[in-house]
Amino acid sequence: AITDHSDDNITVDYMNAVVGLEGSMNSLIPDWHYNTFVQFSRSDGDYTSDVIYDDAITPYQWFNTGSCAADADGVTDVRGVPCITPDWYNPEFLAGNISAEDQAFLFGTETGNTVYEQAQFEAFIDGPVFELPAGTVNLGLGVSFLDERINDTPAETFQIGNAWGSSSAGITKGSKETTAVFGEIAIPLLKDKPLAEAVDLSLSARWTDVDVYGSDTTYKAGLGWQI
């Protein structure tokens, strides 16, 4: 092989912080409890790739008769570096014994960066509502907020499509906010009856709004039957 210049390396710095609080609400509502937390995480990653520069190869008829040195301005079209015309068919070159000058002209190492951040808040309260013959009706209510942000910046060589054998890649940058309100109620229907030691009905609903998509409401019903 002429070269094995194709390594990739990824380095990621990650941090995550969570602060939560839970307890009893007896002073306000007897037998009710609360649970809340705030979370923040950040991922900062560099991805480094070995590249072969396209402007050192493609404009010159793919190793054929073209010559960078024949350009009127004497520099490559994209990077603007002084032209060199490697001796493509020299046995030493084909064996991978490439001079330092040719390597500097043909090869490089480029680094892109991706930063992803996430902030989340959630609060939930639950407790008894009233009594039925079969037991206590329990209710849970909660809210949630999630903010996500990403900024992916490929190396400039990839942004302008100057990596030979690779496709171009643009900057990806954006954010998304998700807000939700949810609730669930558990209703005991039967207890200690023939063929029904316990029958419980659970009902839940969740309203979710995503700023880039819109909002929707989902519902769920479940029946537990213990013989």
PLM region spans:
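Glycine- and other small-residue-rich loops at beta-strand/loop junctions that grip anionic moieties
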Residues: 10, 210, 224
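Beta-strand-rich binding-surface signature
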Residues: 138, 180-182, 200-202
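Feature captures outer-membrane beta-barrel proteins of Gram-negative bacteria and organelles
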Residues: 181-183, 187, 217-226
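Detector for outer-membrane/organellar transmembrane beta-barrel domains
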Residues: 194-200, 222
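Transmembrane beta-strand segments that form the barrel wall of outer-membrane beta-barrel proteins
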Residues: 198-211
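Surface-exposed, low-complexity loop segments enriched in small/polar and acidic residues
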Residues: 1-179, 192-194
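Solvent-exposed loop/turn segments connecting transmembrane beta-strands
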Residues: 175, 208-217
